[in-house]
Amino acid sequence: MPRKGHVSKRDVLADPVYNSKLVTKLINHLMKDGKRAQASSILYDAFDIIKDKTGREPMDVFEEAMNNVKPVLEVKARRIGGSNYQVPVEVRPERQTTLALRWLVSYSRLRNEHTMDERLANELIDASNNTGSAVKKREDVHRMAEANRAFAHYRF
């Protein structure tokens, strides 16, 4: 166990364009090797593509996508009597947001479009329409939790 005590969580500054902490978190997840300017330009270009394709406000599409990707339940491995059980647990709101952002970015990177801003825009549009790989990942996580419902009494 660490001896230096508890590290407090840093507060994220709101994004200057959309005035949203969620957008800043998405930029942080997109960022590679500390290149924040590159990550933010990818995100803003993706938001422009969303506005052109859907005609809707990009923040509305993004928030809807987030709500469709956030998991409610997940499974955690717990060792009981020499065997490991996948125990379904509820996901805390902060972790829901983190997982949703992580899945959106990772499945955007796996898409086949030409540039990253196109990939991200299309993944966000798909997620807002309840399709796409990130939503499928959430469904898989929920299916695992449902399949292991019998072990719910081993809660943490």
UniProtKB/Swiss-Prot annotation:
It holds the Pfam family Ribosomal_S7. Keywords: Ribonucleoprotein, Ribosomal protein, RNA-binding, rRNA-binding, tRNA-binding. InterPro entries: Ribosomal_uS7 (IPR000235), Ribosomal_uS7_bac/org-type (IPR005717), Ribosomal_uS7_CS (IPR020606), Ribosomal_uS7_dom (IPR023798), Ribosomal_uS7_dom_sf (IPR036823). The gene is rpsG. GO terms for molecular function: rRNA binding; structural constituent of ribosome; tRNA binding. GO terms for cellular component: small ribosomal subunit. Gene3D superfamilies: Ribosomal protein S7 domain (1.10.455.10). SUPFAM superfamilies: Ribosomal protein S7 (SSF47973). This is Small ribosomal subunit protein uS7. GO terms for biological process: translation. Part of the 30S ribosomal subunit. Contacts proteins S9 and S11. Belongs to the universal ribosomal protein uS7 family. NCBIfam families: rpsG_bact (TIGR01029). PANTHER family: RIBOSOMAL PROTEIN S7 (PTHR11205). One of the primary rRNA binding proteins, it binds directly to 16S rRNA where it nucleates assembly of the head domain of the 30S subunit. Is located at the subunit interface close to the decoding center, probably blocks exit of the E-site tRNA.
